[in-house]
Regions:
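Bacterial N-terminal signal peptides
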Residues: 9-20
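Phosphate-group recognition and catalysis centered on beta-loop-alpha active-site segments
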Residues: 20-287
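Positively charged n-region of N-terminal signal peptides that target proteins for export
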Residues: 1-9
Length: 287
């Protein structure tokens, strides 16, 4: 009797793969574990270590008396819940230290003070890093260098980041043993839909100022596979900020990013440990 033609049935098999780069990304806690604790405080930085961060990121400015302190904004209004609106550059460290910068987040953090760079350096565990963002210009590099040298911290534990291009150049000149990354963000033209700076403009700047790496806004419209491949060809490290979403984090993981800056280090580490999911058709012959 004739053989019944075989019927090819197609089933979807979910294949889980752990990519080689999946666990390679460093987790950088943006202003500390700032989703859960008041940003840029010792409480937020300590919590970041507890949540498994590889590095903390903090913003640093100069006071009127030349002290390097950790604060994002140029004034104190937001982190005091509006109780004090002082320009950091116009007041002394002693006056800034009278402010409570914790209770605006939660009562449990009442009493947190604006920390100095020296205090932040003192709580960095061995093997962990500080991404030190310079809020200002090249004039901050020498004061920061003095604090770093006096602290005795290893240069390998410090990464300096800055939007200001002249600051990047000054760091390369005065702190050649410390890595420096250029920070970049993008704006979209409402009429044309184009993003600026363009990829070509980014690479022109990199070629001119020669940082060790690029710390870029996590914008997949600009930062795509060809962008990353070019970064690697030209010898730059590849870092992104600020991601609190698991899907976005995995997208950049799969592009081979070196570090992800996040407000939620524990969550993003958990999300990055999820395997990459691929689907393929597997034919099964049934007689």
């Amino acid at each position: 009797m004739p053989q019944t033609p075989s019927v090819l049935s197609c089933v979807f098999v979910t294949v889980f793969t752990l990519t080689g780069s999946m666990l390679a990304q460093e987790i950088v806690a943006h202003r500390g574990a700032s989703h859960d604790a008041p940003e840029n405080t010792l409480a937020a930085f300590r919590l970041a270590w507890e949540q498994g961060a590889d590095a903390i990121e903090g913003d640093f400015r100069l006071t009127a008396d030349g002290q390097v302190v950790c604060l994002h904004d140029a004034d104190t209004r937001r982190v005091t819940g509006g109780e004090a609106d002082w320009k950091v550059s116009e007041v002394t460290l002693a006056k800034l230290r009278t402010l409570d910068v914790g209770k605006w987040k939660r009562e449990a953090f009442t009493g947190e003070r604006i920390p100095t760079l020296a205090e932040v350096l003192a709580i960095i565990p061995p093997g962990k890093k500080l991404f030190l963002e310079i809020k200002g210009g090249p004039e901050l590099v020498k004061p920061i260098r003095r604090v770093l040298v006096s602290s005795g911290i290893s240069p390998q534990q410090i990464v300096i980041i800055a939007f200001d291009q002249n600051t990047v150049v000054e760091v390369r000149r005065l702190l050649p043993e410390v890595k420096v990354y250029w920070l970049v963000s993008y704006k979209q033209d409402k009429e044309t839909g184009c993003w600026t700076p363009t990829a070509d403009e980014v690479f022109q700047t990199l070629s001119r100022i020669r940082p060790h790496g690029l710390d870029t806004e996590a914008n997949p419209e600009v930062v795509n596979r060809s962008f990353v491949d070019r970064l690697r060809r030209e010898g730059y490290e590849f870092h992104v900020w600020t991601i609190d979403d698991g899907a976005r984090a995995r997208l950049f993981r799969d592009l081979g990013v070196d570090s992800i800056t996040t407000n939620r280090p524990a969550l993003i580490r958990q999300e990055l440990q999820k395997p990459e999911v691929k689907q393929r058709n597997v034919g099964q012959e049934r007689q």
